[in-house]
């Protein structure tokens, strides 16, 4: 056998050692994350922030794409339940020619006769959908729609696509854990984006609230945990009818969140956003409206240190835009990836 020093063996046939190789997609992704540089970071100079924010707005609109054709909502109340201190109504309404949304409308009993007053669009995260946040299942800590109606707000709680009643009934429970995956596949083939699809559904949900006789159109807030917080942030950033927003268990950065090996749902991302659209960028579009951020000290998905840094940067953005940085509130609590709710009442009672 020829040795490496044998002149009969071409030099290019000898593999240098050691040679680093990687077979792990996750490791490759992690290495890529470390190399990402923001193309258009928030400028340090306050005078440059307004123009930067408009560039963010343009990038976000391009990533979301064009909305589907609007159809009449044609709302229908299919059920009404006396829930003690409030009434829970099941509502169906149309958002696309081939898609409808089921939702609960929670109305405090002392609001049933009017006049129009404030409302909150409560957006669920991963889990059973609207049932849990309305207090019909799951731990009490996650019943934030129930908390909101008991604070006196009319609350609309739609099921997002692939959750709750919008899971496909012909499939087994085992298959349901892949609902977001197949929806991502279907949307990709159709040239659509699941985040944009759910954002459209929420914008149409705002249309429903605006037209409701018990709702003051100038007093609509949005609140959500985890994926619900993702959608709450994007909704407030793209719809000026939202007067205030509560973002729980989310605001930090994509780079920090994706450095943790956990199963990321494809419904929470946009094509080409890495290095071009960070949490701070989206949040900047909410100014000067008030935002309450909740962060658990033990949240394994959205690190609290990154959340603190992002909130500090967001306050600087507010100041640069001539808005009160005090309108960016941060509730850091002892705990993990969950809703806290300790400052919800005071926050929503403030000016917005």
Task: Enumerate the predicted regions with their spans.
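Short beta-strand-to-loop junctions in surface cap/lid or active-site-entrance loops
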Residues: 81-82, 92-96, 103-116, 138
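N-terminal targeting or regulatory segments adjacent to alpha/beta-hydrolase or S9 domains
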Residues: 1-87, 95
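C-terminal catalytic histidine-bearing segment of alpha/beta-hydrolase fold enzymes
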Residues: 3-4, 312-313, 318-352
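Glycine-rich nucleophile elbow surrounding the catalytic serine of serine-hydrolase chemistry
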Residues: 224-234
């Amino acid at each position: 056998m020829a040795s490496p020093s044998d002149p009969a063996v071409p030099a290019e046939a000898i593999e240098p050692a050691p040679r680093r190789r990687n077979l792990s997609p996750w490791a490759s992704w992690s290495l890529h994350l470390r190399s990402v540089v923001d193309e258009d970071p928030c400028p340090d100079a306050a005078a440059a922030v307004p123009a930067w924010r408009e560039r963010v707005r343009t990038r976000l609109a391009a990533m979301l794409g064009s909305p589907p054709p609007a159809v009449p909502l044609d709302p229908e109340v299919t059920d009404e339940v006396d829930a003690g201190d409030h009434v829970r109504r099941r509502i169906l309404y149309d958002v696309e020619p081939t898609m409808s949304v089921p939702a609960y409308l929670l109305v405090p009993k002392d609001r049933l006769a009017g006049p129009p007053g404030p409302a909150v669009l409560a957006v669920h995260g991963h889990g059973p959908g609207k049932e849990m946040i309305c207090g019909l299942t799951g731990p009490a800590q996650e019943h934030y729609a129930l908390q909101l109606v008991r604070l006196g707000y009319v609350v609309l709680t739609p099921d997002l696509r692939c959750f709750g009643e919008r899971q496909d009934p012909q499939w087994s429970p085992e298959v349901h854990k892949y609902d977001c995956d197949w929806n991502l596949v279907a949307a990709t083939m159709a040239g659509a984006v699941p985040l944009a699809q759910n954002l459209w559904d929420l914008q149409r949900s705002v249309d429903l609230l605006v037209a409701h006789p018990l709702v003051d159109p100038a007093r609509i807030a949005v609140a959500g945990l985890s994926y619900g917080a993702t959608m709450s942030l994007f909704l407030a950033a793209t719809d000026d009818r939202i007067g205030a927003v509560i973002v729980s268990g989310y605001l930090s950065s994509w780079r920090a969140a994706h450095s943790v090996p956990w199963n990321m749902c494809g419904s929470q991302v946009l094509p080409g956003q890495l290095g071009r659209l960070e949490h701070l960028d989206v949040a900047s579009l909410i100014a000067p409206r008030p935002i309450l951020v909740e962060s658990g000290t033990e949240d394994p998905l959205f690190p609290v240190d990154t959340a603190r840094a992002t909130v500090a940067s967001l306050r600087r953005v507010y100041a640069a835009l001539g808005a009160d940085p005090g309108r960016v509130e941060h509730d850091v609590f002892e705990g993990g990836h969950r809703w806290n709710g300790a400052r919800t009442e005071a926050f929503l009672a403030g000016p917005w």
